[in-house]
């Protein structure tokens, strides 16, 4: 079943709102315009932190649906755990939902079910292969973000590759998990160095996947023998008297 931990969700929102984590929130907000350049569509589904929802809203959308918590419903069949029809959304945005969802791969499969043939899927989350992932075992597991599920870029790419998606955008930021006030003035310089020497090892990842469309190619029939059209025998012709 698709379930989220309500406590983890709320604590992550509080974490982003803390003044000490301003730089991480800014990193995410700065990435949103870059992500939006790679997505376009009419029917958008937003799954994740409500803190960043309005950044993805647009008057061009015919529909915009946002959900934060994911739970199973008695009215939803076992094969359809999100209350949406197949092929119903062409833009899907996932902000940290993989991090606080108990079964992230099941969520990915559900996203694929409701995605149209030309859909784009955007994801933001915590990168397992980073300094954040390295220090996570040493941190307090009862506070955010250390009690969340971190995922590697490789695993996420493989999940979507198996389902038939191509990666159209990839980036990471927030190289250092803890930023003392004495270092805050150097954050921009550290970010530049991280882009050059450790582009895949930032604590936050930003990914966009496009669903592959497999066009139907018409096949020309080749006849090995000549196709003969025989005339009707005269006796079979209807004569008007």
Predicted regions and their residues:
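Class I SAM-dependent methyltransferase Rossmann-like catalytic core
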Residues: 1-37
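C-terminal lobe and adjacent flexible extensions of AdoMet/dcAdoMet transferase-like proteins
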Residues: 190-241
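A short glycine-rich, Lys/Arg-flanked "PGG" loop and its adjoining helix->strand segment in the class I
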Residues: 105-120
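Short alpha-helix
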Residues: 147-170
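Conserved catalytic loop of SAM-dependent methyltransferase domains
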Residues: 167-192, 200-202
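Class I SAM-dependent methyltransferase SAM/SAH-binding core
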Residues: 30, 34-82
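Conserved class I S-adenosyl-L-methionine
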Residues: 120-147
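A short acidic, Gly/Pro-enriched loop at the edge of an enzyme's catalytic core
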Residues: 80-92
């Amino acid at each position: 079943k698709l379930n989220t931990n309500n406590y983890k969700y709320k604590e992550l929102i509080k974490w982003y709102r803390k003044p000490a984590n301003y730089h991480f929130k800014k990193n995410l907000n700065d990435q949103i315009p870059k992500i939006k350049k790679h997505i376009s569509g009419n029917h958008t589904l937003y799954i994740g932190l409500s803190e960043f929802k309005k950044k993805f809203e647009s008057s061009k959308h015919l529909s915009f649906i946002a959900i934060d918590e994911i739970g199973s419903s008695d009215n939803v069949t076992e094969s359809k755990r999100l209350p949406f029809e197949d092929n119903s959304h062409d833009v899907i945005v996932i902000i940290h939902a993989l991090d606080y969802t108990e079964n992230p791969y099941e969520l990915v499969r559900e996203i694929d079910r409701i995605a149209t043939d030309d859909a784009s899927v955007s994801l933001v989350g915590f990168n397992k292969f980073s300094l954040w992932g390295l220090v996570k075992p040493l941190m307090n597991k009862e506070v955010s973000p250390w009690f969340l599920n971190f995922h590697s870029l490789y695993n996420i790419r493989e999940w979507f590759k198996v389902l038939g998606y191509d990666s159209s955008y990839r980036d990471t930021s927030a190289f250092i998990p803890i930023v003392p006030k004495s270092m805050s003035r150097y954050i921009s310089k550290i970010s530049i160095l991280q882009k050059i020497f450790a582009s895949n090892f930032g604590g936050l990842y930003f990914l966009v996947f496009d669903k592959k469309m497999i066009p139907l190619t018409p096949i020309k029939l080749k006849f090995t023998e000549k196709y003969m059209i025989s005339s009707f025998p005269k006796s079979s012709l209807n004569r008007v008297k």
